[in-house]
């Protein structure tokens, strides 16, 4: 009797193990349950180590390397001190962003200073971004999305994104601008307070984020499209007819205007009033931030995203796919190369700040590569890089698109149960918002690519293919080979940390004087 019982239990274990392993192609399988458990375990183990790393490096940077206001901090700190003195109507005309970060810094100052009286004002203000980056961002923003899409990304990786972590140590606007707009996205995807309250909360966070960076109003539009699209997919039954789905989205927006569109429309109306009052999207010094047609900016953005996402896509098959595309479409590829060269020639804006400020990596990238006087480098070297980066950006998106059956609707009843994926409609919206956000900017600033990266990365999953070897399925009759994305997700984390450590070492060790500045200057993104 016991033997039968043990045999039954053993059979149940085998059945459970087989159920956990899913056959995704002939001879190829994935153990999704194990991948999820491993991902959660890695995040739980790595997160406290990251906390220690960022706290220690913050202390080292603030006390030993830059205990003084660095670059734009003199404007941000100065304006916050003005508010501390109660001068709420006084504004530094050189500041171009809204006062959100100064108000947040003010609140943090009144909370921290009575407890840690020996801490300097600069340290307390910088602490705003550190706390946001290592606590609020991974726990309140990324964690809820991760629980819905544990195979897509690791919170410990995204909180370590190199373009973002630079500002954990400084009093800049980028960290909280990112946190708030992505919190708005998180509310739409996870609906933590139900389908109505969550949308209003999402709109609230999006509106507040515009007090930190004006261009977040564009991302508010993208989030609104998602808020309308996800219930429309089910209620209007999206199918393979692309144009029909656009119409269904529009009709659903009208049908449920008060719950899905009105919350965001309030933000748009308020922003329109701001534009009329200010006569520009830019506050303060408008002459140095006048909008233009800087189309090559999209190639800069795609190149940065491609480099940072290298562990996600790199494989022999991916490179073969690019070569195959060139072979199959040689004429189209030729004209694409010509188009990129023409964009480089006629739509490259060289801002005076870019050529004059050697405290940014973009200064060196532009002089030695992007804007090199040699046509061989500027055109014939950079054009293939831009072309491949655009291909990589779009190709990684392609298999992550939510597709539909021509007739049969999705077997899902609630929007909250939809996968964290975009349709052809929202992919188009994402690319459009990315271009509208960065193309008008005359400045080549990598921090402008933080949000385009995050909005792209959250909706994709990394490849499960081997990095070097070809993926060969098991032969017929043999057990299928099991593939996993865990190694690549872990590599993504290590890849980011490599950038973080290298840039931190450069920032710490490389210094030089400026005649107009009282302290030594250093290099950041």
UniProtKB/Swiss-Prot annotation:
One of its GO terms (cellular component) is endoplasmic reticulum. It is found in: Endoplasmic reticulum membrane. One of its GO terms (biological process) is dolichol-linked oligosaccharide biosynthetic process. Glycans are attached at residues 31, 278, 372. Pathway: Protein modification; protein glycosylation. The keyword Transmembrane helix applies. GO terms for molecular function: dolichyl pyrophosphate Glc2Man9GlcNAc2 alpha-1,2-glucosyltransferase activity; dolichyl-phosphate-glucose-glycolipid alpha-glucosyltransferase activity. InterPro entries: Alg10. It is a multi-pass membrane protein. The chain crosses the membrane at residues 36-56, 95-115, 128-148, 151-171, 188-208, 214-234, 257-277, 295-315, 334-354, 376-396, 424-444, 448-468, 493-513. This is Dol-P-Glc:Glc(2)Man(9)GlcNAc(2)-PP-Dol alpha-1,2-glucosyltransferase.
């Amino acid at each position: 009797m016991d033997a039968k019982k043990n045999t039954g239990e053993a059979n149940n274990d085998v059945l459970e193990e087989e159920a956990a392993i899913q056959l995704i192609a002939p001879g190829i399988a994935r153990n999704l349950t194990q991948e999820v458990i491993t991902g959660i375990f890695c995040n739980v183990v790595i997160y406290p180590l990251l906390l220690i790393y960022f706290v220690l490096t913050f202390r080292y940077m603030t006390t030993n390397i830059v205990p003084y206001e660095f670059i734009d901090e003199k404007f941000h700190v100065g304006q916050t001190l003005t508010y501390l003195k109660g001068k709420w109507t006084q504004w530094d005309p050189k500041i171009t962003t809204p006062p959100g970060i100064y108000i947040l810094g003010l609140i943090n100052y009144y909370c921290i200073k009575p407890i840690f009286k020996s801490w300097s004002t600069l340290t307390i203000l910088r602490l705003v971004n550190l706390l946001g980056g290592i606590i609020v961002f991974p726990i309140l923003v990324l964690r809820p999305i991760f629980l819905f899409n544990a195979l897509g990304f690791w919170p410990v990786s995204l909180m370590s994104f190199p373009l973002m972590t630079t500002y954990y140590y400084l009093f800049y606007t980028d960290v909280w601008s990112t946190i708030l707009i992505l919190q708005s996205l998180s509310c739409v995807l996870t609906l933590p307070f139900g389908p109505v309250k969550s949308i209003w909360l999402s709109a609230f966070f999006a509106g507040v984020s515009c007090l930190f960076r004006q261009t977040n109003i564009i991302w508010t539009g993208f989030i609104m499209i998602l808020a309308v699209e996800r219930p429309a997919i089910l209620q209007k039954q999206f199918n393979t007819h692309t144009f029909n789905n656009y119409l269904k989205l529009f009709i659903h927006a009208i049908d449920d205007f008060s719950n899905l569109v009105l919350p965001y429309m309030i933000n748009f109306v308020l922003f329109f009033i701001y534009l009329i009052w200010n006569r520009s999207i830019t506050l303060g010094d408008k002459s140095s931030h006048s909008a233009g047609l800087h189309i090559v900016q999209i190639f800069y953005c795609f190149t940065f995203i491609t480099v940072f996402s290298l562990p996600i896509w790199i494989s022999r098959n991916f490179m073969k796919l690019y070569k195959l595309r060139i072979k199959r479409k040689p004429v189209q590829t030729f004209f694409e190369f010509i188009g990129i060269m023409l964009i480089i020639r006629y739509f490259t804006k060289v801002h005076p700040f870019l050529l004059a400020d050697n405290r940014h990596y973009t200064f060196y990238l532009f002089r030695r590569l992007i804007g090199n006087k040699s046509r061989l480098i500027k055109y014939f070297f950079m054009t293939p890089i831009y072309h491949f980066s655009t291909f990589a950006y779009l190709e990684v998106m392609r298999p992550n698109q939510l597709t539909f059956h021509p007739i049969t609707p999705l077997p899902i009843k609630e929007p909250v149960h939809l996968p964290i994926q975009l349709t052809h409609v929202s992919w188009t919206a994402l690319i459009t918002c990315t271009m509208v956000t960065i193309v008008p900017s005359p400045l080549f600033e990598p921090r402008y690519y933080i949000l385009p990266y995050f909005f792209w990365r959250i909706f994709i999953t990394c490849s499960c293919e081997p990095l070097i070897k070809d993926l060969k399925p098991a032969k017929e009759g043999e057990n299928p080979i099991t593939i996993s994305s865990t190694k690549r997700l872990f590599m993504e984390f290590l890849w980011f940390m490599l950038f973080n450590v290298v840039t931190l070492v450069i920032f710490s060790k490389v210094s030089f004087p400026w005649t107009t500045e009282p302290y030594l200057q250093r290099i950041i993104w």
